[in-house]
């Protein structure tokens, strides 16, 4: 496909984006808004953002959800801006500095919350800054300005949603159904690989792919939940399927690890059974029926615990899968599965990374303020706004540098494109609203196609072009003002990019160590006799941390294996029949405190000291288990855990 070619699958969204822009433009001028540009800009960003992220037309519900987040972020930002102005109206410089800190604070929060919700906080940060900067000439008009901006933004969001509904958005339900079938086959094939106990790298690749696919399925569940309330039952089932899929991965990998020391546990009966190849979900269904008969014949005691648990989880997966596909009423058996253990929320491991993002945003905004005050440039305020926008939105993404480059390319492309519209097209459409709508629809259509291709600079060009062309009421054509706005955007993006380069993010290794120590803490916390604690479902949180580790350190197999081993240890100890007595319970609390100290230690020396203390406590704990005559189901996992911690002591403590 050529660089300027148009694929059929890109046309519908391009028309949708053009329609959203035209609707916002028409409504803005029809209701005599002072700056319809904000409504048009909002409609374009809300519609195009999910398409750029997805690399194609977004699924149903994505645009609505983004619009909802934008409304929340705008209102939070407006309220914060009003509070800052009311409190500091007599100290303008202090007021702007506080706004810079507010933008950094919102970026810090957006780095810690779920990626889906971080957009609202990023928006809240720079909305307050926009209000404070814009009202500098007339601060008494602040409430009116805030209300007008909110109204224009809400109109833009409504127009984007109307365009989305008008062009029948894609439903993700069929993709979910196909993935459920395919994922079950992949789970069975992973178990086959683990029982064969073949090449470790092949097994690592297989379970790594399954972790990514299970995480992707969880993302599909979020999309399905946003799409319509009629999928509420399917959403409940998919939430339980996520845990079951992670359980299947854990049991398969534990089957592989067990054979490193005790290969005789997997009998020839099961080896021969899992030799039969499977290609479809129907093949897996037949094999599971046969496998349940084999287990009933051999007995639970003669069946390895990992295989028994795997078959139980796969059977539940199958049952819920059928319910998701048919979306029928939840029956009593399904309800029993769905009323499972409460999920534990994951503890953020990127606090240092979030603090780096805080300083990047705050310093870049302060640098923009100094540049504005030092030069006295009329578009210094525009540069400041672009600095806040770039840093607030870039920091929450995995590669902020590339986001800043995208904005630079976009603002550079917007200069000639905006010039064409400002000097030629818009002046010649002054007598016709229809011609004005058509001209902007053409802009939205072609940039909508480029956005779906994820062309570098396309998203920035769309927003920057709309921002600098004259879409005010009434329209005024001052070339110096246009040039100032265009150059202000470019300078702001370059300054933001400079700060991102200068304030280096060296938090990757620290985040990796925190994640690994959180796995250790989870394994240690599984050693408990507290019934409520044992019923907590840590698996989704642990695999979410593993997925983050895989993204932070792609290809680092030793780290992945260590993390997976800790997850397996956690699951095994959680189900182990630990003797119930006060002596062991008190020691469990002591070990949990020590594990927490390892995570929170700020220096390598303290971390090594607490880790050494944890190893000593594990030795004492093993002795206590022998005194209290704990069964092998308890002593063996604890011994394996202690051995792993001894082996990887330096990786878990050294910076």
Swiss-Prot record:
It is a multi-pass membrane protein. Keywords: Cell inner membrane, Cell membrane, Membrane, Transmembrane, Transmembrane helix, Transport. The chain crosses the membrane at residues 13-33, 38-58, 67-89, 93-112, 121-141, 152-172, 370-390, 407-427, 431-451, 459-479, 482-502. Induction: Positively coregulated with aaeA and aaeX by AaeR. It is found in: Cell inner membrane. Disulfide bonds: none annotated. One of its GO terms (biological process) is carboxylic acid transport. GO terms for cellular component: plasma membrane. One of its GO terms (molecular function) is transmembrane transporter activity. InterPro entries: PHBA_efflux_AaeB/fusaric-R, PHBA_efflux_pump_AaeB. Belongs to the aromatic acid exporter ArAE (TC 2.A.85) family. Forms an efflux pump with AaeA. Could function as a metabolic relief valve, allowing to eliminate certain compounds when they accumulate to high levels in the cell. This is p-hydroxybenzoic acid efflux pump subunit AaeB. It comes from Escherichia coli O9:H4 (strain HS).
